[in-house]
Curated annotation (Swiss-Prot):
The protein, known as: Adenine phosphoribosyltransferase
Name of the gene this protein is made from: apt
Listed GO biological process terms: adenine salvage; AMP salvage; purine ribonucleoside salvage
Top EC class for this record: transferase
GO terms assigned for molecular function: adenine binding; adenine phosphoribosyltransferase activity; AMP binding
Gene3D superfamilies hit by this protein: 3.40.50.2020
Role according to the record: Catalyzes a salvage reaction resulting in the formation of AMP, that is energically less costly than de novo synthesis.
InterPro entries assigned: Ade_phspho_trans, PRibTrfase_dom, PRTase-like, UPRTase/APRTase
Species this chain originates from: Picosynechococcus sp. (strain ATCC 27264 / PCC 7002 / PR-6)
Length: 172
């Protein structure tokens, strides 16, 4: 299936000169969504990834993460922006192009030695995925892989990530 044909291009968003890859059209396509989820699971199986948890980054990692976790017989754990999780959290602050941001995970969600696959819809510069990996590594987790629907190759986000397989279905 040609998944690229199911992704809408939005020029000059969020600012001039940026071509935004909108996956909402893929999400709205039943066969495309099924194919995407099956292909993500297959990528993980072929890479022999056997996580204890799939960690989804806010917010589109929440769309793909639970189904991926279910199919890999793993738990699903969300990583959120500040103030969204109500129990005690671990936090990490990371640099953005213009400032900083923070990510949080419940303290009781993962533990030292847990094998983790991190999932999101898209990797561009890799900043959020790197911060998520740093947060989990600080806890003592073992990052065994990263899974993305879309990878923007020219931004070289995978080069910023720790040494673990980086799997993506669609590359631009």
């Amino acid at each position: 299936m040609d998944l690229k044909s199911l992704i809408r291009d939005i020029p000059d968003f969020p600012k001039p000169g940026i071509l935004f890859r909108d996956i909402t059209t893929l999400l709205n396509h039943p066969e495309g969504m099924r194919y995407t989820m099956d292909a993500l699971v297959q990528l993980c199986l072929e890479a022999n990834l056997k996580p204890d948890h799939v960690v989804g980054m806010e917010s589109r990692g929440f769309i793909f993460g639970p189904t991926l976790a279910y199919n890999l017989n793993a738990g699903f754990v969300p990583v959120r922006k500040p103030g969204k999780l109500l129990a005690a959290v671990h936090t990490v602050e990371y640099e953005l192009e213009y400032g900083t941001d923070t990510l949080e995970i419940h303290q009781d969600a993962v533990g030292s030695g847990d094998k983790i696959v991190i999932v999101d819809d898209l990797i561009a510069t890799g900043g959020t995925a790197k911060a998520t990996a740093e947060l989990l590594t600080k806890i003592g987790c073992d990052i065994i892989g990263f899974v993305f629907i879309v990878e923007l190759l020219d931004l070289k986000g995978r080069d910023r990530l720790p040494d673990a397989p980086v799997l993506s279905l669609i590359q631009y």
